[in-house]
Amino acid sequence: MVDGLPVEACRIDVWLWRARLTKTRALASTLAAEGRIRLTRAGAQTRLDKASRTVRPGDELVFALAGRVTAVRVLELGLRRGPPAEARALYEPVSAT
């Protein structure tokens, strides 16, 4: 919540950084700009091409980083880059099928 209003969407680079799935926001931006992140929203899959694309709770993301494929479902957007326990509450792992 910001000023009492729920946050509905967040930039993909900011969310990946807050969720501690990437070490830096610049790395998250590069992943998006290179088209290495797939977003599934309401059954439609899209390859992201910009760091400014948004994610919402319920979206699923699939991306490869450090030789490992990661698939997660966005649960919350978060307001900051908190400790690891707080970051893990922002997503849940899903099978990459």
Residue ranges of each PLM-predicted region?
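Strongly charged
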Residues: 2-18, 29-30, 38-97
